[in-house]
């Protein structure tokens, strides 16, 4: 009897709930349509390639890999063009120096649409912070990249590299090409562990190391999420196997970072441990962070510490891996330049068997080759901003505040209007006389402006030491049957690895 009395009320309640859900859905749809109309109006003055009625340019980019397709679009649409990801997300894709300067000289925040996916792992570190807190963190972290701090790292770079090269000696003896990318990634993470946490032995000599696997997994999963529209909603993503895998990897990475920070803080409370730290040859990145204070004496919170350490591990590991791997690929493709770099390094070392800080500045030809490699294969092929205020470009066209910008560094570096014969590998583009008068935003491997890469000197030093030691130990040549397939996955990777043949150069060649 009671149930029959309640059933009309429940029916009415269900009806009202359905009406409310329908109204919310309609309002949401109207909001999206209004937003799309507003975005389309803002981009009226920017013609672009034809797009799919539902997916925008996403299918074309997924089908072609996007990188070289955008390069062809630079010829059809000078300066920039709209890039639609579906019907409701659009970036102005720019690849011209004056357009890049108009945005990247200002310090606009990173585009939340892209970088919010990073928050679960790296938190609010320097990469995603904005406003006064970004400025405070940038100021606190800058001393960590002073040359006095960087000097002792040269020996650490060399130590980790030699472990990798010994492994390559065994692989080279099989007279088969092999993929260098994973080994370089292992070495780069090993180096970062030592420079960040001060570990004499990071424990990364085993392929099943949980932290290494977690960091590798996280970068791959983040790119997959950015590329898959169905994963953009948090609620949906965390219910998927990929989402759960991401959370597990995050937990492993966070547990490791928290453990190391707790250990170091405890050591700073112990007099004996304090003395050991003072007697160490160098400060590591964590030392710098723990000692950082602003003008008011305020230090970084535990959450800030973890965010900056995780950010440094993320940005410093994969980008360096990409830069070194593609550089060695370029050296394999161009044996004349490879030999000239090798001879330069031998001349600098003379009778010595180890590098010193002052040697790095003398690697002029190797540096030119490295920059030319970065031009053709930038470690980070795209970066994103969201305009905090309107911008007017050099040709008079403008965009309102809130607009999303994609700086396509890969297309900028291969833009024939900026770089003559852009597909030709020519290190002399970066000779002092040829660099004179070049637009400061024509070459942006480390971004540019106030939000440029704070660790670029650290990265350049590491890549010089690593590649110089590689060239002293081996002669590199390509495998024509396994040409790398470029793919952007936050960094520039190869879909099928970077397979090279290595020929040992014998005793006295840098071992």
UniProtKB/Swiss-Prot annotation:
Its EC number is 1.14.14.1. It comes from the Eukaryota. GO terms for cellular component: endoplasmic reticulum membrane. It is an enzyme of class 1 (oxidoreductase). Heme binds at residues 315, 453. Keywords: Endoplasmic reticulum, Heme, Iron, Membrane, Metal-binding, Microsome, Monooxygenase, Oxidoreductase. GO terms for molecular function: heme binding; heterocyclic compound binding; iron ion binding; oxidoreductase activity, acting on paired donors, with incorporation or reduction of molecular oxygen, reduced flavin or flavoprotein as one donor, and incorporation of one atom of oxygen. It is found in: Endoplasmic reticulum membrane; Microsome membrane. InterPro entries: Cyt_P450 (IPR001128), Cyt_P450_CS (IPR017972), Cyt_P450_E_grp-I (IPR002401), Cyt_P450_sf (IPR036396), Cytochrome_P450_Monoox (IPR050196). The keyword Iron applies. Induction: P450 can be induced to high levels in liver and other tissues by various foreign compounds, including drugs, pesticides, and carcinogens. It is a peripheral membrane protein. Present abundantly in renal microsomes of male mice but not in those of female mice. Also present in pulmonary microsomes of male and female mice. Not found in liver. PROSITE patterns: CYTOCHROME_P450. It catalyses: an organic molecule + reduced [NADPH--hemoprotein reductase] + O2 = an alcohol + oxidized [NADPH--hemoprotein reductase] + H2O + H(+). GO terms for biological process: biphenyl metabolic process. Its main location: endoplasmic reticulum. Gene3D superfamilies: Cytochrome P450. The keyword Transferase does not apply. Its cofactor is heme. Responsible for mutagenic activation of 3-methoxy-4-aminoazobenzene (3-MeO-AAB); a potent procarcinogen. Also active on 2-aminofluorene and 2-aminoanthracene. Belongs to the cytochrome P450 family. This is Cytochrome P450 4B1. It comes from Mus musculus.
């Amino acid at each position: 009897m009671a149930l029959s009395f309640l059933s009309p009320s429940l029916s009415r309640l269900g009806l009202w709930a359905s009406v409310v859900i329908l109204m919310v859905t309609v309002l949401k749809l109207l909001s999206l349509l209004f937003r799309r109309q507003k975005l389309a109006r803002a981009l009226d003055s920017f013609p672009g390639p034809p797009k799919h009625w539902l997916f925008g340019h996403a299918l074309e980019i997924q089908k072609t890999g996007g990188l070289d397709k955008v390069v062809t679009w630079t010829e059809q649409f000078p300066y920039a063009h709209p890039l639609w990801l579906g019907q409701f997300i659009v970036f102005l894709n720019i690849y011209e120096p004056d357009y890049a300067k108009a945005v990247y000289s200002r310090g606009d925040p990173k585009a939340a649409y892209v970088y919010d996916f990073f928050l679960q792992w790296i938190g609010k570190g320097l990469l995603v912070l904005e406003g006064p807190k970004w400025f405070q963190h940038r100021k606190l972290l800058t001393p960590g990249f002073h040359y006095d701090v960087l000097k002792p790292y040269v020996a650490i770079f060399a130590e980790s590299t030699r472990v990798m090269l010994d492994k390559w000696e065994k692989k080279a003896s099989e007279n088969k090409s092999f993929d260098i990318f994973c080994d370089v990634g292992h070495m780069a993470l090993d180096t970062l562990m030592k420079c960040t946490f001060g570990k004499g032995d990071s424990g990364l000599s085993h392929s099943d190391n949980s932290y290494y696997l977690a960091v590798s997994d996280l970068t791959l999963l983040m790119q997959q999420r950015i590329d898959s529209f169905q994963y953009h909603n948090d609620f949906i993503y965390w219910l998927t196997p990929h989402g759960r895998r991401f959370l597990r990897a995050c937990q492993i990475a966070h547990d490791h970072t928290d453990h190391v920070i707790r250990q170091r803080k405890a050591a700073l409370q112990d007099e004996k441990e304090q003395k050991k730290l003072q007697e160490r040859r160098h400060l590591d990145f964590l030392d710098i962070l723990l000692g950082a204070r602003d003008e008011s004496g305020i230090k970084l919170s535990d959450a800030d510490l973890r965010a900056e350490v995780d950010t440094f591990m993320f940005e410093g590991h994969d980008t360096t891996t990409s830069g070194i791997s593609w550089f060695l690929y370029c050296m394999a493709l161009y044996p004349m330049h490879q030999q000239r770099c090798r001879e330069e390094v031998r001349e600098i070392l003379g009778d010595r068997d180890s590098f010193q800080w002052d040697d790095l500045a003398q690697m002029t030809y190797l540096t030119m080759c490295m920059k030319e490699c970065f031009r053709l294969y930038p470690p980070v092929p795209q970066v994103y901003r969201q305009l905090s205020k309107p911008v007017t470009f050099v040709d008079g066209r403008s965009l309102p505040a809130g607009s999303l910008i994609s700086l396509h560094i890969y297309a900028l570096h291969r833009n024939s209007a900026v770089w003559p014969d852009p597909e030709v590998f020519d290190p002399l583009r970066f000779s002092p006389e040829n660099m004179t008068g070049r637009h400061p935003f024509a070459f942006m491997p480390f971004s540019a402006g106030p939000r440029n890469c704070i660790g670029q000197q650290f990265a350049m030093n590491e890549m010089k030491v690593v590649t110089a030691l590689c060239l002293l130990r081996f002669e590199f040549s390509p495998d024509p049957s396994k040409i790398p397939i470029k793919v952007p996955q936050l960094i520039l990777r190869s879909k099928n690895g970077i397979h090279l043949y290595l020929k040992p150069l014998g005793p006295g060649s840098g071992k």
